[in-house]
Regions:
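A short, sequence-level motif marking secondary-structure junctions
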Residues: 112-114, 155-158
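Edge beta-strands of extracellular beta-sandwich domains
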Residues: 145-157
Length: 158
């Protein structure tokens, strides 16, 4: 879901004549007869679940539209992963974000290195995690006022 919204955002950002963007719905909701995903009779296009738990896409829009300091590791609920992780993606409106796996830095990406239409999507590629153990995925976001925020996830390598 968040990947679709990232693609749409790129389209919106180059069309300066658009004066507004709208989200279809904030929350997933009941929809009799609908069969999609793993839940029947539910429209699952909301930014949050029916239980009001924010999905990744919620944090994408928060990083784009809000001035509130945001840093969020995506796909965090996918806890069990192959040891070769194709990418780690973080949504943040910070000036720079650093990724650490088990307290080892995998580099800091500056916002000025990102394309304008992806200025809140930070991606590290070809990351390896240890098999059979919980790996601590940590990001630290650095903001222009000198403050920082961190986010954590734990992924177990298969």
């Amino acid at each position: 879901q968040s990947q679709l919204h990232e693609i749409l955002w790129k389209q919106f950002s180059v069309r300066k004549y658009l004066w507004a963007e709208f989200i279809w719905c904030m929350f997933d909701f009941a929809s009799y007869g609908r069969v999609e995903g793993d839940t029947k009779s539910q429209n699952d296009k909301g930014l949050c679940t029916r239980e009001r738990i924010p999905k990744d896409v919620y944090f994408f829009y928060k990083s784009v539209w809000s001035s509130e300091k945001t840093v969020y590791i995506t796909e965090r609920r996918h806890e069990f992963r192959a040891c070769d992780v194709p990418f780690v993606k973080v949504y943040s409106n910070a000036d720079a974000v650093e990724l650490c796996i088990n307290d080892v830095s995998h580099g800091r990406i500056s916002r000025c290195e990102l394309p304008d239409d992806e200025s809140t999507v930070f991606v590290w590629k070809n990351i390896k995690i240890k098999p059979g153990t919980k790996n601590k995925i940590c990001t630290k976001a650095y903001f222009s006022d000198g403050t920082s925020r961190t986010d954590y996830a734990f992924w177990t390598g298969k």
